[in-house]
Amino acid sequence: MADLASRITKPSDEPVDAVAPAPTATTGEGNGTEEPVDDGVNKGLVETTYDVEVKLSGLQADDESLLYSGVASFEELGLAKSINDGLLAMNFKKPSKIQEKALPLMLSNPPRNMIAQSQSGTGKTAAFVLTVLSRVDLTKPTQPQALLLAPSRELARQIQSVIQTIGQFCENLNVEAAIPGSISRETGVRANVVVGTPGTVMDLIRRRQFDVSQLKIMVIDEADNMLDQQGMGDQCVRVKGMLPKDIQTLLFSATFPEKVMIFARKYATNAHEIKLRHTDLTVKGISQMYMDCPDESKKYDILCKLYGLMTIGSSVIFVRTRESASEIQRRMEADGHKVSALHGAHEGQNRDALLDDFRSGRSKVLITTNVLARGIDVSSVSMVINYDIPMKGPGDKEPDMETYLHRIGRTGRFGRVGVSISFVYDRKSYDALSKIADHYGLDLVQLAPDDWDATETKVQEVIKSSRARPDYVPNAGDK
């Protein structure tokens, strides 16, 4: 078992220049840090180089050299003028690394399936949105032709917004969200693009309120969770069985555990595959820290001490259960702190309003369960707190590596510096974080609960830093 102590960097242990070098790309791109590029909706995405592995399926040798090289500009893709106008309006200047490799494959004819692994903030959403917009016949504004599935209503609404933003000049583009309470029983689905959650989509098809006969493309975001048999795998299989057999299937996620990848290859047969090296999966630009709490009861006291730092930007506190989220909200509000809690027990419209308040900055501290761990983009988030270490399996005995990665990916987005702080208090939580650190090769910065001035200084240095360097580690001499 890995020892967490061996993965810890105390703030004063290393010189300021001891920053992990960015991995070198092996797909023909230059080394170093890229200029900021836009991800389609949010500006300022910074991409460090990473190794992109491309596995082509069923192509002739002459085709492989072209598709491996990717594209250097959107103009090379032959997109419709209305789509290009949307890209220009969003100041979307050049493809990101994942877009360079994935878009030529996804847009090729005849359509081919794709399994794409790409970490948060690399432009994966814009990649599949461009493909969807290119497949839709806009002369049929009420005929469903594209289906996108997401694990939560929050992510479905976000994807809907991205499609509408990039497709703002696409005449007759209609995008509906198939989430609980959103589709009228009288009219059913009346849009050419549908974004929804699997359960609602399945119900609409069964009630014959969703005509799937002319669907051309299906996208599953956060596919590792959606296809996991402990998650929504059964629902996704049933939905797929209701769709045309020749539908193009695109699977996207930041992580693909091996057991899920095996199933994904059966779900999206003969698919091209694009993925990052295992060592490139941790999110760049996030300083990952660790707080050894004296006991479980002290976690709350330390959380309250962090409140002043949480409100420099926006912060997300991840807890294990809905009950914990509500209880921490109650206690913090009683202590005079302004916080919100969002979890699955809230009604749909209430959840929408809570997330909208958080996005707009009206609410700056959000307590939540894993419902927000995946895919949600709020660019102002500067801190993520793992109040409870993510666990999985019977009795929560195993650390959940993938959920840890998704959680911390809510900060450090679009070129900004972010901080994640994980609380441990006993042997189980200590060992769990130790295994996560060992799995991703993390050097965690230790924060001292008994030296609050030093802790506060170090966290502030990162949050307020304008350097935005990958893997930034605070140092006593780093001002």
Swiss-Prot record:
Regions that span the bilayer = none
Where, in this chain's numbering, is ATP bound?
Answer: 118-125
Single GO MF descriptor: ATP binding
Q: Where is this motif: DEAD box?
A: 221-224
EC nos? 3.6.4.13
Q: How does it sit in the membrane?
A: Peripheral membrane protein
Q: Which PROSITE patterns match?
A: DEAD_ATP_HELICASE, HELICASE_ATP_BIND_1, HELICASE_CTER, Q_MOTIF
The record's section on Pfam families has: DEAD, Helicase_C
Where does it localize?
A: Cytoplasm; Nucleus, Nuclear pore complex; Nucleus membrane
- What's this protein's family per the entry? Belongs to the DEAD box helicase family. DDX19/DBP5 subfamily.
Please state what the annotation says regarding this protein's domains: The Q motif is unique to and characteristic of the DEAD box family of RNA helicases and controls ATP binding and hydrolysis.
Briefly state the protein's biological role.
ATP-dependent RNA helicase associated with the nuclear pore complex and essential for mRNA export from the nucleus. May participate in a terminal step of mRNA export through the removal of proteins that accompany mRNA through the nucleopore complex. May also be involved in early transcription.
Q: What is this protein called?
A: ATP-dependent RNA helicase DBP5
